């Protein structure tokens, strides 16, 4: 996990080095990519390919979106691109690894807050080296947030069904 920590921190420095990155539309009116997204993703894929030469990649800024049973890295080089180029300081770098379509480990780094989240299957999760856990709060007392996958119409109904299932329980 130390290698993942170092890799994410280096990518975070790279992300912050772009002061006014060029912004490109990905086709949808609210779906963007910046030159920083492309550079950070390239850096991450290159570094991970050297360490794991047989690995596959499911990277946001490319069309490599096939999930197999092989070790696969799922990468969002700048999660929160719109916030990033609008300087809202609410973006992070996300890497997950799955094998046989099951999570193996993941890392999320927020370079603005210098917060590193690392998790490994069977070993738990940490934030800046401190163990974190889910609470034992019952669902009817919980606060729940969710994303809506706004760029993928095929996921709209799944989001709606999920929210419809949860709402009566909170």
Functional labels for PLM-detected ranges:
Residues 1-78:
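N-terminal subdomain of lithium-sensitive/metallo-dependent phosphomonoesterases centered on the IMPase/IPPase/PAP
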Residues 69-73, 93, 104:
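Short loop/turn microsegments at loop-to-beta-strand junctions
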Residues 86, 95:
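Glycine/small-residue-rich loop that forms an oxyanion/phosphate-binding "nest" at active or ligand-binding sites
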Residues 96-170:
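Acidic beta-strand-loop-alpha-helix segment within the catalytic core
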């Amino acid at each position: 996990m130390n290698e993942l920590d170092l890799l994410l921190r280096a990518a975070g420095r790279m992300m912050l080095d772009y002061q006014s990155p060029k912004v490109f539309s990905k086709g949808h009116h609210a779906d963007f990519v910046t030159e920083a997204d492309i550079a950070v993703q390239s850096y991450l894929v290159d570094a991970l390919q050297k360490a794991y030469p047989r690995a596959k990649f499911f990277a946001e800024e490319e069309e490599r979106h096939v999930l197999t049973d092989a070790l696969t890295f799922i990468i969002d080089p700048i999660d929160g691109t719109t916030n990033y180029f609008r300087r809202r300081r609410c973006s992070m770098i996300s890497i997950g690894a799955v094998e046989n379509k099951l999570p193996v480990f993941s890392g999320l780094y927020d370079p603005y807050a210098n917060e590193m989240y690392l998790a490994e299957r069977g070993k738990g999760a940490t934030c800046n080296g401190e163990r974190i856990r889910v609470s034992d709060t019952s669902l009817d007392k919980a606060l729940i947030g969710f994303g809506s996958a706004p760029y993928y119409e095929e996921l709209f109904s799944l989001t709606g069904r999920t929210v419809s299932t949860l709402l009566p329980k909170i």
